[in-house]
Swiss-Prot record:
The lineage of its organism: Eukaryota, Metazoa, Chordata, Craniata, Vertebrata. Its main location: membrane. Residues 619-630, 748-761 have a biased composition (Basic and acidic residues). The gene is Scarf2. GO terms for cellular component: membrane. This is Scavenger receptor class F member 2. The keyword Cell membrane does not apply. Homophilic and heterophilic interaction via its extracellular domain. Interacts with SCARF1. The heterophilic interaction with SCARF1, which is stronger than the homophilic interaction with itself, is suppressed by the presence of SCARF1 ligand such as Ac-LDL. Residues 455-833 are cytoplasmic. Residues 1-33 form the signal peptide. It comes from Mus musculus. Disulfide bonds join C67-C78, C72-C90, C92-C101, C118-C126, C120-C133, C135-C144, C148-C155, C150-C162, C164-C173, C177-C185, C179-C192, C194-C203, C207-C214, C209-C221, C223-C232, C236-C243, C238-C250, C252-C261, C368-C376, C371-C383, C385-C394.
Length: 833
């Protein structure tokens, strides 16, 4: 135990002596090492009073940037086995204890003052500072707890593996080796390993390789460096390479080439045999011949060898620039930043420019073909035709009936002939003239209508005293309306074919005027497809189309307001009224004067004639009550309410077009000479006038025109009775007042007008021919007190030849029979009563 302690004390003393020598060197030679600045926050660092100089505090010495070495000086100097831990304080080293620190720790203890117990005792010894175990012979393990099993060797202190002594092999070194002196035994396998220069199984053959080793099994020479040949007797001449061991060819090192590897790689190449190319080194600088490294790279490249392009979206020096966006999402060039690829039809740094100058495709590398009246598509090169043409080269005009882009739209013209570009309809010469004439006509008509409105508005502002004037002075507005209607009939006819004209509607109402005048233009060409229309059809007051009749009737309010005034005026004239003399005009005369207005009136359609006669009579009866009473003085109408407003006709027998055709029209159109065998005057168009074509003349103009006295045609008187009008007779009876007669006729007119829109089939024409006989009989009975000449005229039937020319006259004959029946019954009623 003591021997062991003395052996352990020697190394400790030597370690302490080395520590003291180090401290002495640091003390004596402080200037050998450059002093390091102290850290103001380091351990034991103080400032000199009165200055900012940093220094170690008292009792401490600098170590690095702080003061970590304690100084024990003077009487406090530490002994050999002591360590200064604080200024003037010493402690025993690890492994020693005692008052003077001169006693070594026992084997089972270690550490400061020998306070730590050793865990590897008693098969080992702990190190004084760390406590690590050092096992005794034949022991191994972390705490020396395992016994060594090697028979002819030692155990590894950590793993326990056997280390066999020479001549022994195996896991526990229990097998002996049988090798010659020129070999050694393998401790794992027991095989003999020949020494250098010997070969064979027993290593008893010497190598003949010129001092070079040979293979142990075959004896083949393994030449040393820079030697080659079968016996390694030839010298290698490769400067920067290795020789082949058999033929001596050189295998050059990286960066050299040539037969003897004496030529360095040219610029831009590196590697074995200079077969690899350098990357994009900046300025054509050579790369390292061995590894191919570049100092700096060209713009757009990076990597140690400058062989990698910039990442997507970056370009330029060091790949530090971000690419601007390219059209259609393409990436830019990693060197220049420009777009690398553009879609077909686009070029430019950002693919923002279309192909021009007749080019198309990728990079605008293709030339467009001739596209005629079109242009080339900058992407595909296909011809895009302008409106009106088509075809692969845009040189074919659109066929008839088509227009627009690629001739894909159909023309809307009736003749299917339109402009191939715009689709506008072509107008022929006569059509253009028709449109121009229609425009001029509309302008003229608008001017006339405005004049009429101004006149009517001026008449409305008259004071109440003007209303009390005689009925003769009130005829001016009525005459003006009739004149305007006749002027419109005289306007020329303009063929418009299928062209449409705007519709003009002007309505006028004048409280002073007892007529309510309305003017409507005819339906459009599509609604009424007639080749032409006249002003008569346009502004006739007796239109009976599907859009409704256009007429002039006494206004109800105006009639009611003026009824008292007219009744008073009528009473003053009744006393002087008697049978009309030969020289005065009669209702038959009025009917004869009406058709003689103009040729243009006779050329109007046969639909408006009969109805126009009735409307004209209604207007005259309202405007001239005194004269009407004078003419109707011979009749005595029943004062019963049902006679004032007769019931409407039976819808089953009502004609489709008008309820006042036939004999009334014939009588209105008949001139003053005897009607037998007489024909109507021809119209300007060359057509013969029929009773249905008779026109109506405004009452104002008819009254002003004087004419010779003529007997009233009996058919006209019969028709007047059929319509509810009073006619002069020889028998004097109480005359009906003009307002009452006008009200009755207006009510009957409204009832008849409402039934015009109903589309019933008219009765057969054969039944209408027999309607004359009852009317003639009733007319003879009711006119028994008339003069002899008037009775003869009433009993004589009117000629039927003109009425047979137009089929439209036949339905009204039945209506005339029904209308004539009611007045006849009304005429007999007073006699019966």
């Amino acid at each position: 135990m003591e021997g062991a302690g003395s052996r352990g004390a020697g190394p400790a003393r030597r370690q302490g002596a080395r520590g003291l020598g180090l401290l002495l060197l640091l003390w004596l030679l402080p200037g050998l090492a450059a002093p390091q600045d102290l850290n103001p926050r380091g351990r034991n660092v103080c400032r000199t009073p009165g200055s900012q100089v940093l220094t170690c505090c008292a009792g401490w010495r600098q170590l690095g940037d702080e003061c970590g070495i304690a100084v024990c000086e003077g009487n406090s100097t530490c002994s050999e086995n002591e360590v200064c831990v604080r200024p003037g304080e010493c402690r025993c080293r690890h492994g020693y204890f005692g008052a003077n620190c001169d006693t070594k720790c026992p084997r089972q203890f270690w550490g400061p003052d020998c306070k730590e117990r050793c865990s590897c005792h008693p098969h080992g010894q702990c190190e004084d500072v760390t406590g690590q175990c050092t096992c005794h012979a034949r022991r191994w393990g972390a705490r020396c707890e395992h016994a060594c099993q090697c028979q002819h060797g030692t155990c590894h202190p950590r793993s326990g593996a056997c280390r066999c002594e020479p001549g022994w092999w195996g896991a526990q070194c229990a097998s002996a080796c049988y090798c010659s002196a020129t070999s050694r035994c393998d401790p794992q396998t027991g095989a003999c390993l020949c020494h250098v220069g010997w070969w064979g199984r027993s290593c008893n053959n010497q190598c003949a390789c010129n001092s070079s080793p040979c293979e142990q099994q075959s004896g083949r020479c393994q030449c040393r460096e820079r030697m080659f040949g079968a016996r390694c007797d030839r010298y290698c001449q490769c400067s920067h390479g290795r020789c082949h061991p058999v033929d001596g060819t050189c295998a050059c090192d990286p960066g050299y080439r040539g037969k003897y590897c004496r030529e360095p790689c040219p610029a831009g190449f590196y590697g074995p045999g200079c077969r690899r190319r350098c990357g994009q080194c900046k300025g054509q600088q050579p790369c390292t011949v061995v590894e191919g490294r570049c100092l700096t790279c060209e713009p757009g490249w990076n990597g140690t060898k400058c062989d990698q392009p910039c990442a997507t979206g970056f370009y330029g020096e060091g790949c530090g620039h971000r690419c601007p966006p390219c059209r259609d999402g393409h990436a830019c060039n990693h060197v220049t930043g420009k777009c690398t690829h553009c879609n077909a039809g686009w070029i430019g740094d950002r693919c923002e420019t279309k192909c021009s100058n007749g080019t198309y495709g990728e990079d605008c590398a293709f030339v467009c073909s001739d596209c005629g009246s079109g242009h080339c598509d900058f992407q595909s090169g296909r011809c895009l035709c302008s409106p009106g043409v088509h075809g692969p080269h845009c040189n074919v005009t659109c066929p008839a009936g088509l227009h627009g882009v690629d001739c894909a739209q159909a023309c809307s013209c009736h003749e299917e002939s339109c402009d191939p570009v715009t689709g506008a309809c072509h107008l022929e010469t006569n059509q253009r003239k028709g449109v121009m004439g229609a425009g001029a006509l509309l302008t003229l008509l608008l001017g006339l209508l405005l004049s009429l409105l101004g006149c009517c508005c001026a008449c409305r502002g008259k004071d109440s005293a003007r209303r009390e004037l005689t009925l003769g002075r009130k005829k001016a507005p009525q005459r003006f309306c009739g004149s305007f209607s006749r002027i419109s009939m005289k306007l020329p006819r303009i063929p418009l074919r299928r062209q449409k004209l705007p519709k003009v509607v002007v309505a006028h109402h004048d409280l002073d005027n007892t007529l309510n005048c309305s003017f409507l233009d005819p339906p459009s060409g599509l609604e009424q497809p007639s080749p032409s229309w006249s002003s008569r059809a346009s502004f006739s007051s007796f239109d009976t189309t599907d859009e409704g009749p256009v007429y002039c009737v006494p206004h109800e309010e105006a009639t009611a307001d003026s009824r008292d005034l007219e009744a008073t005026a009528a009473l003053t004239e009744v006393a002087a009224v008697s049978l009309e003399p030969t020289g005065t005009s009669t209702p038959g005369e009025e009917a004869a004067v009406l058709p003689a207005s103009s040729d243009s009136e006779r050329s109007a359609s046969s639909v408006e004639g009969p109805s126009g006669a009735l409307y004209a009579r209604v207007a005259r009866r309202e405007a001239r009550p005194a004269r009407t009473r004078n003419e109707a003085g011979g009749l005595s109408l029943s004062p019963s309410p049902e006679r004032r407003k007769p019931p409407p006709p039976d819808p089953a027998t009502k004609p489709k077009v008008s309820w006042i055709h036939g004999k009334h029209s014939a009588a209105a159109a008949a001139p003053s000479p005897p009607p037998a065998g007489r024909k109507a005057a021809p119209s300007p168009s060359g057509r013969k006038r029929t009773p249905s074509n008779s026109s109506v003349q405004p009452p104002g103009l008819t009254e002003e025109a004087p004419g010779p006295a003529s007997p009233t045609p009996p058919r006209a008187r019969a028709r007047g009775r059929g319509l509810g009008l009073s006619e002069p007779t020889d028998a004097g009876g109480p005359p009906r007042s003009a307002p009452e007669a006008a009200s009755m006729l207006a009510a009957e007119l409204r009832d008849k007008t409402r039934s015009l829109g109903r589309a019933e089939k008219p009765p057969p024409p054969q039944k209408a021919k027999r309607s004359v006989l009852p009317a003639a009989t009733v007319r003879t009975a009711s006119a028994s007190e008339a003069s002899g000449s008037e009775k003869a005229a009433a009993s004589a039937p009117a000629p039927e030849t003109p009425r047979k020319k137009t089929p439209i006259q036949k339905p009204p004959r039945k209506k005339s029979r029904e209308a004539a029946g009611e007045p006849s019954r009304a005429g007999t009623a007073p006699g019966a009563s």
